From Swiss-Prot:
Record note on domains: The PARP alpha-helical domain (also named HD region) is regulatory, it packs against the catalytic domain.
Gene this chain is encoded by: Parp16
Lumenal face of the membrane: 309-322
One BP annotation, GO: protein auto-ADP-ribosylation
Gene3D superfamilies per UniProt: 3.90.228.10
Pfam families: ARTD15_N, PARP
Lineage of source species: Eukaryota, Metazoa, Chordata, Craniata, Vertebrata
Record organism: Mus musculus
GO MF terms, alphabetically ordered: kinase binding; NAD+ poly-ADP-ribosyltransferase activity; NAD+-protein mono-ADP-ribosyltransferase activity; NAD+-protein-aspartate ADP-ribosyltransferase activity; NAD+-protein-glutamate ADP-ribosyltransferase activity; NAD+-protein-lysine ADP-ribosyltransferase activity; nucleotidyltransferase activity; protein serine/threonine kinase activator activity
Name recorded for this polypeptide: Protein mono-ADP-ribosyltransferase PARP16
Entries under InterPro entries matching the protein: ARTD_PARP, PARP16_N, Poly(ADP-ribose)pol_cat_dom
């Protein structure tokens, strides 16, 4: 890895450590998955030897990565290998990710439609910006059409590939209403498909995360949904059903995108699993030594009973009462 790449990665991590941490977390989640051969794409070429992916070496090196704040503060020569790996994780010629303020979530809710049920506010919010030519190509495809904003839920291990390769309709396993990428205007529905998963052990975001994508979708006939005809209250049936659909028409609040060029991920909503609060040290000690405590109390009770039944105790007690 060239020194300039390390310097660029250090600068990127210094500028937005949480965004850099997110990319490390998504990478680590894909690496730990039993489907890692398919979800860890792209894969670092330096760990591909003789056309074989050395997952064990990559797992070992990833496990040795300190958290990014520690890595930024360190200047040890032994950290060069760590920076080589982080540099690869953060490198992209297509996009960049940066942290967004939580107030941006209100804007997202407006873009997707006000929720009918209370939805949890994400712990972290990130925005993706695309470089040319990918960005200009998307807007060329859009032309004069409107943009639809909708949520896509998926397992954490899939997001490394989703970010770098996009959402591909032919890879989607949910096909009740036809082949395509399924999205929804209801965040609570998307969260069902985004269970918490193990990310990076040293993540500043937390070791267990859930992620939901907010997608920009070009309003095109290849995007199937319950939508009204222009200047009419009647549903456009040509867009409400996909050929060979087993479930009939697309339900309300859902979108099925049948063309990969019509959508891209714009935001990432990240939820960190709350760790149970630590009990006080006293409670912790009591819970750890409950058997010893109970036995001690039992022995103390036996001692009290024994003493109270003794003649010496009765003699002393009678003298006290006089």
């Amino acid at each position: 890895m060239q020194l300039s790449n390390r310097a660029a990665a250090r600068e990127a991590a210094s500028r937005d450590v949480l965004a850099a941490d997110l990319r490390c977390s998504l990478f680590a989640s894909a690496l730990q998955s039993y489907k890692r051969d398919s979800v860890l794409r792209p894969f670092p070429a330096s760990y591909a030897r003789h056309d074989c992916k050395d997952f064990e070496a990559l797992l070992a090196d990833t496990g040795r990565l300190p958290n990014l704040k520690e890595l930024l503060q360190s200047s040890r020569d032994t950290d060069k290998q760590a920076w080589d790996l982080v540099s690869w994780i953060l490198s992209s010629k297509i996009l960049t990710i940066h942290s967004a303020k939580k107030a941006e979530f209100e804007k997202i809710q407006q873009l997707t439609g006000a929720p009918h049920t209370p939805v949890p506010t994400p712990d972290f919010l990130f925005e993706i910006e695309y470089f040319d030519p990918a960005n200009s190509r998307f807007y060329e495809t859009k032309g004069e059409r409107d943009l639809i904003y909708a949520f896509h839920g998926s397992r954490l291990e899939n997001f490394h590939s989703i970010i770098h390769n996009g959402l591909h309709c032919h890879l989607n396993k949910t096909s009740l209403f036809g082949e395509g990428t399924y999205l929804t205007s209801d965040l609570s529905l998307a969260l069902i498909y985004s269970p918490h998963g193990h990310g990076w052990q040293h993540s500043l975001l937390g070791p267990i995360l859930s992620c939901v994508a907010v997608c920009e979708v070009i309003d095109h006939p290849d995007v199937k949904c319950q939508i009204k005809k222009k200047d009419s209250k009647e549903i456009d049936r040509s867009r409400a059903r996909i050929k060979h659909s087993e479930g009939g028409e697309i339900p309300p609040k859902y979108f099925v995108v049948t063309n990969n060029q019509l959508l891209r991920v714009k935001y990432l909503l990240v939820y960190s699993q709350k760790q149970p609060k630590r009990a006080s040290s006293q409670l912790s000690w009591l819970s750890s030594h409950w058997f010893v405590i109970m036995m001690s109390l039992y022995l103390l009770l036996l001692l009290i009973v024994s003493v109270t039944n003794s003649s010496v105790f009765h003699h002393f007690w009678n003298r006290v009462k006089r």
